[in-house]
């Protein structure tokens, strides 16, 4: 057994008919953990329903449907490997809660594959003012997905026919747009692909192929393998948002969550925000195994001394008492992008915020300024209202105690989705937090240390 490959999480984004599902399905099909038998079954069903041309998308739809019906699909199906990395596709659009998931991210994406349709008319629709290509690229950047690969898909379409001119035209347009969003276009590979034929997905196109005659760059899999290894924030102070709190007979209170930054280890004294309670960690476990320590990305349960289950809740944040412990907030300022709200938003609007594992109503107490959503330049001070498509700096006040952080310091605790009318109305990034000092309880074991 060699050294374990580094894990990289991918999110696949792009306009509705760009061929995302076919491309993703094909990737998983070729490199992933789907059993041959399951694929053959899907192929047969697709053919019977006259959907032969959708066979790879069909694979993905089947997986998604099962996932949405709550049948837990072996997550290995969504994994595939390259020479250097082990990739997991953590989400593909088409999921109802895609945007919310992308923000509160059960796991944060390290890399985005932006799939665009190359045929004339289709590409233009995706990149138009209200096209999803724009929306998704902007979201990915706003939410801190640092690396991107563009798949110029549907190159096999009869109106493209592997044309170098069309590829260059589309690439140039994408570069202009990605630069506006904030990416460095020179660092974003544009890979011509066909999700349907599989051309240039897994291996470089043959020189005799219409594409191979002019394209000499990497295939999609190589481009993925060439990505920079993600840096994990081990050296930051501990932040661990609680997903659940259990009471386990004979053991006691066990909070559960994912370490976002820093390390947690037995013997450490931790503080929970927003309540300010401090106690000692007795043990840390992952998959029923005791660990000497756990770091970013680890989903763990940890046992705490002399703390009742009633004292801790989902959405609380655990941190190291001696190293920048987390605190509740009185208010915070955030840059908010309104995605889809049917009316006008005024000061006093109070939707629900999903930030890390917290789900709390927050009031837009003050609209500070309206800004250009791409350049960040100020457009007007204290606007009367904001609406879909606007970006604004807003002062927010939570309806009950909550713990959030500035995005620059602790990214996973500094981005949020605004939910209203059962959809994601806006996304936000927290710029600054006004902390609230509380006299928290300290258990005996914490006081001793």
UniProtKB/Swiss-Prot annotation:
Modified residues (N6,N6,N6-trimethyllysine): 79, 187, 310, 400
Places the protein is found: Cytoplasm
Positions of post-translational N6-methyllysine modification: 265
Residue numbers of N6,N6-dimethyllysine PTMs: 55
Any single GO CC term annotated in Swiss-Prot or TrEMBL for this entry: cytoplasm
Top-level taxon of the source organism: Eukaryota
CDD domains found in the cross-reference section: EF1_alpha, EF1_alpha_II, EF1_alpha_III
Binding site for GTP: 14-21, 91-95, 153-156
Leader sequence residues: none
Gene3D superfamilies: P-loop containing nucleotide triphosphate hydrolases, Translation factors
Single GO molecular function: GTPase activity
SUPFAM superfamilies from the UniProt entry: EF-Tu/eEF-1alpha/eIF2-gamma C-terminal domain (SSF50465), P-loop containing nucleoside triphosphate hydrolases (SSF52540), Translation proteins (SSF50447)
Family: Belongs to the TRAFAC class translation factor GTPase superfamily. Classic translation factor GTPase family. EF-Tu/EF-1A subfamily.
Function text: This protein promotes the GTP-dependent binding of aminoacyl-tRNA to the A-site of ribosomes during protein biosynthesis.
Protein name (database record): Elongation factor 1-alpha
